Amino acid sequence: MDNLSLQHICYLVLLFFVFSVLGWCMEVLLKYIQYHRFINRGFLIGPYCPIYGSGIVFITVMVSILSGMESSVGTTFSISFIGCGILEYAVSYYLEKRFHARWWDYSTKPMNLHGRIWIGNLILFGIGGTLVIEAVSYTHLRA
């Protein structure tokens, strides 16, 4: 992504929507396994959780910006871990102030920050972001 062309913007928009839907599917599936019934995990009308789409777009852009530097799996994991943590905290804070409600609360889990982010999810986001970026890179190299 040397320059921000229409093709790059379309790619990022596609990533946003695909991963918003996949994130919603994952959350609904996890809650179905936990409670044995359907629970809509989105706060919007429709099957998507925009925080997942925003996260993957953020990771993709940051890895692209830093690609001129030494790029590694560790760098991608760090960007995913830290970036998703900042994004999740900011979104949680905004939603609480704007709508006077909390969409998630990790306060009962160890190693959380104000109940907004939790180390366990950050590790999963780091791994997930790394897997997605590596898969996308591998796919682009083969194309």
Question: What residue ranges belong to the model's regions?
Answer:
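Short, strongly hydrophobic alpha-helical membrane anchors
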Residues: 1-8
